């Protein structure tokens, strides 16, 4: 009888555990969702068109988000917003990185020597989303310097499609001007609204920039023109790269 009683107690306990687990079932839609988008009032609208309401946060990251216009965020998508649209969700915001936004300098814009300077800049990634051409960039800065480097995307004359030059004014803080051990690497995210320039539903794009030549793992102080080209589609969407997490430094303007 003692064995029977023990078995019955075990079964009851197991059923209670199952019941508790069922009641505490995790309804989170997606963990560790990374996306880029714009802050709209108290909400975040991703480049995919999803509307996110922050109902939980880590620390004071939501307050930091509200101080920006565009950001890259890390969040858990908890559930669909009650009474909301099909693309409306409640999220737990874990982290955010500010994204600098600037207008493209068009053919009609009067240019200055300052804005067209072509100091080396390493364009790590380019992608199109939400009507923006987005970049993740890196460049050397002199250790301890607070000089903001100037970044621009400048439209160029071309006979076919669209050609843009990604420019960087380092204000003298280049690798050839100082020994390598006097530099840190800075950078981050920057977005340019592409729909303000490209009006077609589909068009060929090319972006060029200047960076240092590399020989294996050795970076030279010689420079070269690098570039990438592809097809722009007005309603297209490209997911942002998942590898970069470095914050956009205050040394970019």
Model-identified regions with their sequence ranges:
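Bacterial N-terminal signal peptides that target proteins for export
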Residues: 1-10
């Amino acid at each position: 009888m003692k064995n029977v009683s023990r078995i019955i107690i075990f079964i009851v306990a197991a059923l209670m555990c199952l019941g508790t687990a069922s009641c505490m079932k995790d309804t989170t839609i997606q963990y560790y969702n990374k996306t880029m988008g714009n802050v709209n009032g108290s909400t975040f609208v991703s480049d995919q068109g999803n509307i996110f309401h922050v109902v939980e946060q880590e620390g004071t990251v939501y307050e930091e988000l509200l101080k920006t216009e565009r950001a890259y965020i890390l969040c858990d998508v908890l559930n669909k917003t009650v009474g909301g649209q099909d693309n409306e969700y409640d999220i737990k915001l874990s982290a955010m990185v500010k994204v600098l936004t600037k207008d493209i300098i068009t053919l009609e814009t009067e240019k200055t020597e300052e804005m067209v300077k072509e100091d080396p800049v390493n364009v790590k990634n380019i992608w199109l989303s939400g009507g923006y051409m987005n970049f993740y960039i890196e460049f050397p800065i002199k250790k301890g310097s607070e000089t903001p480097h100037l970044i621009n995307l400048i439209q160029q004359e071309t006979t076919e499609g669209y050609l843009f030059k990604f420019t960087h004014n380092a204000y003298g803080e280049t690798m050839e001007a100082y020994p390598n051990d006097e530099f840190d690497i800075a950078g981050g995210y920057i977005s340019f609204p592409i729909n303000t320039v490209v009006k077609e539903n589909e068009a060929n794009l090319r972006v060029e920039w200047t960076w240092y030549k590399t020989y294996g793992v050795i970076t030279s102080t010689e420079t070269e023109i690098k570039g990438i080209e592809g097809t722009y589609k007005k309603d297209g969407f490209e997911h942002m790269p998942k590898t970069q997490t470095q914050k956009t430094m205050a040394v970019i303007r």
